[in-house]
Amino acid sequence: MLLPKRTKYRKMMKGRNRGYATRGVDLALGEFGLKAVEAGRVNSRQIESARQAYTRHVKRQAKTWIRVFPDKPITKKPLETRMGKGKGGVEEWVMNIKPGRIIFEMSGVSEELAREALTLAMHKLPFKTKFVTKESENEVY
């Protein structure tokens, strides 16, 4: 499970997830990747589930990179608790994803195998994504 070792503050404000990604939008490490088409947030369990799905399919032949890291704490108050008494405890760690962000990268396998593997990972994520290559990464999403 991905989570920060330590943080300056335990809890964070909710914020808004608007606009398009400006960083992490190009394939930097691999030949193929998975790019977000819509906004959302992804937690460490979803990242791990997607990673396992594509790793099993390529049978560890490919070199892969995870380009996102959940560094935002999400809090939740216990069930049947009255309002007030402060903010709840940290429930999970997430990362806000904006359209255009590269989630996973892969190299060392054929395009066909990479497409199949990353399609399995797409189904594990809570927002729409698309398969990109070095040639197709600059297309409008």
UniProtKB/Swiss-Prot annotation:
Regions annotated as coiled coil? none
**One cellular component GO annotation, for this chain's record?**
cytosolic large ribosomal subunit
The record's Pfam families line, in alphabetical order, gives:
Ribosomal_L16 (PF00252)
Please name the PROSITE patterns in this protein's record.
Answer: RIBOSOMAL_L16_2
Which CDD domains does the record match to this protein?
Ribosomal_L16_L10e
Biological process terms in GO annotation:
translation
GO molecular function (one): structural constituent of ribosome
Question: What keywords appear on the UniProt entry?
Answer: Ribonucleoprotein, Ribosomal protein, RNA-binding, rRNA-binding, tRNA-binding
**Matches recorded under SUPFAM superfamilies:** Ribosomal protein L16p/L10e
Gene3D superfamilies in the cross-refs: Ribosomal protein L10e/L16 (3.90.1170.10)
Q: Which InterPro entries match?
A: Ribosomal_uL16, Ribosomal_uL16_bact-type, Ribosomal_uL16_CS, Ribosomal_uL16_dom, Ribosomal_uL16_sf
Q: How does it assemble?
A: Part of the 50S ribosomal subunit.
Give the protein family.
Belongs to the universal ribosomal protein uL16 family.
Which HAMAP family does its entry note? Answer: Ribosomal_uL16 (MF_01342)
Q: What does this protein do?
A: Binds 23S rRNA and is also seen to make contacts with the A and possibly P site tRNAs.
Q: What name does UniProt use for this protein?
A: Large ribosomal subunit protein uL16
Which organism is this protein's natural source? Answer: Campylobacter fetus subsp. fetus (strain 82-40)
List the lineage, top down: Bacteria, Pseudomonadati, Campylobacterota, Epsilonproteobacteria, Campylobacterales
